């Protein structure tokens, strides 16, 4: 019996030490989200090991489930899991579920996440995006090469003309747009008290915006312009005229700068015009925008015959191939997904699954914490997600991890019996050391 107790029991003091360590690791995880999927996966593996070693699962799951949003994340995951039972393309289904498994991460995160770490986690993600931006500038100014390999191990790989080092240009610009919007909001509501951090935030907003103009991710531009309006509305919602004036002024200034001084932005606007002309005049959909339009068209055709429960988690592209192989055979070679999450989910798991997904987003948008700033950051991130889901992706390693981690941090409302020190120079150095270790692990995996 004593042996069983030793195996099954761990002291409360040690449990609290593990909880503190897991919170610190989640800070590292957040920093790595925009930088290295393999490195952040290694961090999560360590968190999972600590979660298992801490034991006492029932009590900690009770703490996690005190947050009503958790059940909606899990419910959406279970819908896709159920969709596996009637799918034919199991390989595609397994690939999708490997990404969608992040939906159940809040079950683990909320079982240890202390609310005092919430903004530290958010700040870590912001600094991760800042690091990515700095590397992007170093590549753009040809201070470092566009590709960096150490032996057979890839550090990053991009091009001088579109220097998004760690993510593709769409994801890179989305990350910048979200961080710019969050920082503008925090400055407007005076959430950042330290004068040096205020100056740093203002510099980051400026350089991040300029960096976006160097990158060819059109989705990021749209997300940024719409989020600017949202941020101003959240801050000045009682003064609607002021909202429109400030929002339109900022958006107009940004647009004029990009259109007149950004070759990449100008090129992407011209590309969009040419794509649209080609679709209208020549019925040619073999272009960036055209492929999204034609893929959406065939996805709608799939939905028409399978609107209730869909075709299964992995069968959407297979069904699109069947419908398009005679008239538009190039589609299946050029696109790997419908490029519209709303249509994709409708095709995968039908109107039932779609309703559950939208219910999850609705519950997140209307969720109230004890802090208005948290509520509004949740709104900024959720609205951004709902926007980039239209032409882009959500169930990917970057987008879903970003969404789940930051939302978990913002909705966390529990204080564990742990001592949380303010972040100082020494603790920042420790974070940097741990980040470097996990980056090395990620690179060599």
Model-assigned labels for residue ranges:
Residues 54, 233, 244, 348-385:
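Hydrophobic transmembrane alpha-helices and their immediate junctions
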Residues 31, 51-61, 83-136, 169, ...:
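Transmembrane alpha-helical segments and their membrane-water interfaces
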Residues 215, 235-282, 297-305, 313, ...:
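A membrane-periplasm/extracellular boundary helix in multi-pass inner-membrane enzymes
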Residues 46-51, 228, 360, 378-388, ...:
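Transmembrane alpha-helices of multi-pass inner-membrane enzymes
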Residues 282-297, 301, 305, 309-349:
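Long extracytoplasmic/lumenal interhelical loops at the membrane interface
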Residues 21-29, 71, 204, 336, ...:
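Loop-to-helix entry and N-terminal half of a specific, functionally important transmembrane alpha helix
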Residues 1-88, 116-117, 123, 187-199, ...:
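Transmembrane signal-anchor hairpin modules in multi-pass inner-membrane enzymes, especially those
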Residues 118-151, 167-237, 257-261, 367, ...:
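Alpha-helical transmembrane segments of multi-pass inner-membrane proteins
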């Amino acid at each position: 019996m004593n042996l069983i107790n030793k195996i099954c029991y761990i002291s409360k003091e040690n449990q609290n030490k593990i909880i503190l360590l897991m919170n610190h690791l989640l800070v590292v995880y957040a920093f790595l989200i925009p930088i290295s999927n393999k490195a952040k996966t290694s961090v999560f593996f360590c968190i999972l090991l600590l979660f298992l070693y801490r034991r006492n699962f029932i009590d900690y799951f009770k703490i996690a489930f005190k947050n009503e949003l958790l059940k909606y994340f899990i419910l959406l995951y279970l819908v896709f899991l159920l969709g596996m039972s009637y799918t034919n393309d199991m390989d595609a289904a397994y690939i999708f579920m490997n990404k969608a498994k992040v939906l159940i991460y809040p079950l683990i995160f909320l079982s240890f996440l202390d609310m005092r770490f919430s903004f530290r986690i958010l700040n870590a993600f912001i600094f991760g995006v800042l690091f990515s931006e700095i590397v992007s500038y170093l590549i753009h100014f040809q201070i470092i090469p566009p590709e960096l390999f150490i032996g057979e191990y890839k550090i990053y790989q991009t091009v001088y003309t579109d220097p998004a080092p760690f993510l593709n240009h769409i994801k890179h610009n989305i990350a910048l747009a979200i961080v710019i919007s969050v920082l503008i909001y925090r400055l407007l509501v005076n959430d950042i008290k330290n004068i040096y951090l205020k100056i740093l935030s203002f510099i980051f907003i400026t350089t991040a915006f300029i960096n976006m103009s160097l990158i060819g991710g059109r989705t990021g531009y749209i997300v940024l312009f719409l989020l600017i309006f949202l941020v101003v509305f959240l801050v000045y919602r009682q003064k609607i005229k002021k909202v429109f004036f400030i929002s339109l002024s900022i958006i107009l200034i940004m647009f004029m700068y990009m259109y007149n001084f950004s070759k990449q932005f100008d090129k992407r606007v011209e590309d969009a015009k040419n794509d649209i002309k080609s679709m209208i005049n020549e019925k040619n959909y073999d272009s960036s925008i055209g492929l999204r339009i034609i893929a959406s068209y065939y996805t709608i055709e799939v939905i028409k015959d399978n609107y209730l429960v869909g075709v299964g988690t992995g069968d959407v592209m297979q069904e699109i191939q069947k419908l398009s192989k005679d008239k538009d055979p190039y589609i299946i070679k050029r696109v790997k997904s419908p490029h519209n999450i709303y249509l994709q989910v409708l095709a995968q798991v039908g109107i039932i699954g779609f309703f559950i997904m939208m219910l999850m987003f609705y519950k997140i948008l209307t969720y109230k914490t004890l802090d208005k700033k948290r509520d509004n950051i949740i709104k900024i991130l959720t609205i951004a997600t709902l926007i980039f889901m239209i032409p882009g992706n959500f169930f990917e390693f970057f987008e879903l991890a970003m969404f789940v981690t930051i939302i978990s941090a913002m909705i966390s409302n529990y204080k564990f019996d742990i001592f949380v020190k303010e972040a100082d120079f020494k603790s920042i150095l420790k974070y940097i050391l741990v980040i470097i270790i996990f980056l090395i692990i990620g690179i060599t995996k």
